[in-house]
Amino acid sequence: MLVLTRKLKEAIQIGDDIEVVVLAIDGDQVKLGIRAPKHIDVHRKEIYLAIQAENNAASLASITSLQQLSDQLKKGGKYDER
């Protein structure tokens, strides 16, 4: 992990497209501004992890539903979504 020290209004450049600026420091909180292209998602870590968990749960539900549908079709029956 690269560790950098920055003062108020100083920035860090990541590649050609991403800039992180220290906007404010208040006690133990630091407010950061992030400039990044629109195609790059920027989230707080806890939000990112929640999104990943939801996506994983949704993909598992889809796999289960598809397997149930496949099993029913193999038996010649109709699929019941209940």
UniProtKB/Swiss-Prot annotation:
Places the protein is found: Cytoplasm
Gene Ontology molecular function terms on file: mRNA 5'-UTR binding
Function: A translational regulator that binds mRNA to regulate translation initiation and/or mRNA stability. Usually binds in the 5'-UTR at or near the Shine-Dalgarno sequence preventing ribosome-binding, thus repressing translation. Its main target seems to be the major flagellin gene, while its function is anatagonized by FliW.
Main localisation: cytoplasm
Pfam families in UniProt: CsrA (PF02599)
Family membership noted in the UniProt record: Belongs to the CsrA/RsmA family.
Keywords tagged on the record: Bacterial flagellum biogenesis, Cytoplasm, Repressor, RNA-binding, Translation regulation
Protein name: Translational regulator CsrA
Gene3D superfamilies: Translational regulator CsrA (2.60.40.4380)
CC terms in the record's Gene Ontology section: cytosol
Subunit composition and interactions: Homodimer; the beta-strands of each monomer intercalate to form a hydrophobic core, while the alpha-helices form wings that extend away from the core.
Family annotation (InterPro entries): CsrA (IPR003751), CsrA_sf (IPR036107)
A biological process from GO: regulation of bacterial-type flagellum assembly
